[in-house]
From Swiss-Prot:
The gene is coaD. Signal peptide: none annotated. GO terms for molecular function: ATP binding; pantetheine-phosphate adenylyltransferase activity. It comes from Salmonella arizonae (strain ATCC BAA-731 / CDC346-86 / RSK2980). This is Phosphopantetheine adenylyltransferase. GO terms for cellular component: cytoplasm. Keywords: ATP-binding, Coenzyme A biosynthesis, Cytoplasm, Magnesium, Nucleotide-binding, Nucleotidyltransferase, Transferase.
């Protein structure tokens, strides 16, 4: 039986920290779905289609990764995709409380849905999409934190 996992997030935009998590997940699971949430309430900089395209290009070298957008409940998306594992990244203790709430709610909605928490590599432990966008808005160099295609897209958005 194939182990299918979902790594959900807004990915606005996808960072090297996200790529670190998804790359490591590909070594643990047969198939990883990078699930990009529409998240209209977060007022994303990039459209859902743009975020999907950026992530597809950034993960093209990972043969067992599929990128898909979604706007439904995560538990419903997981059920539809026949995945029973959620991958979540934990950067700091502060992330844990919120992630624990999400894990319990998802498990309530889909009892067989397990959450697996991965810590990013030390190099990426402090970055977030929001922080990268904020630094870039103030002309800070964020090249190191983003895949090349994403960096170019971000610079174009900020022009």
């Amino acid at each position: 039986m194939q182990k299918r996992a979902i790594y959900p997030g807004t990915f606005d935009p996808i960072t090297n920290g996200h790529l670190d998590i998804v790359t490591r997940a590909t070594q643990m699971f047969d198939h990883v779905i990078l699930a990009i949430a529409a998240s209209p309430g977060k007022n994303p900089m990039f459209t859902l289609d743009e975020r999907v395209a950026l992530a597809q290009k950034a993960t093209a070298h990972l043969s067992n990764v599929e990128v898909a957008g979604f706007s439904d409940l995560m538990a419903n998306f997981a059920r539809d995709r026949q995945a029973n594992i959620l991958i979540r990244g934990l950067r700091a203790v502060a992330d844990f409380e919120y992630e624990m709430q999400l894990a319990h709610m998802n498990r309530h909605l889909m009892p067989q849905l397990e959450s697996v928490f991965l810590m990013p590599s030390k190099e990426w432990s402090f970055i977030s999409s929001s922080l990268v966008k904020e630094v870039a808005r103030h002309q800070g160099d964020v090249t190191h934190f983003l895949p090349d295609n994403v960096h170019q897209a971000l610079m174009n958005k900020l022009k």
